[in-house]
């Protein structure tokens, strides 16, 4: 698989709509606060749906500003980001974060 990772999700997704670049997936920052993003979450979701490629979300916890449960259920319920990459700093964080991820994404099938 050939993927593209970006720190500017909205700009990159809109660029992909105009280019001939054939990629299999996109990895981008996404969270309900819009932190580490170049547009609003709503605009980014719209762009994700237009591009129609599988998305891996990163920075979904907004560098710890959001609780794992709230952040992960928000992303999962959107239905357009079926995979997330999660950063953790301790065993306690890992247990809390991955438990929330399993609950939020259980039954979801990656696009």
Where are each of the predicted segments found?
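Beta/alpha (TIM)-barrel catalytic core signal, keyed to glycine-rich beta->alpha loops juxtaposed to Asp/Glu
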Residues: 1-111
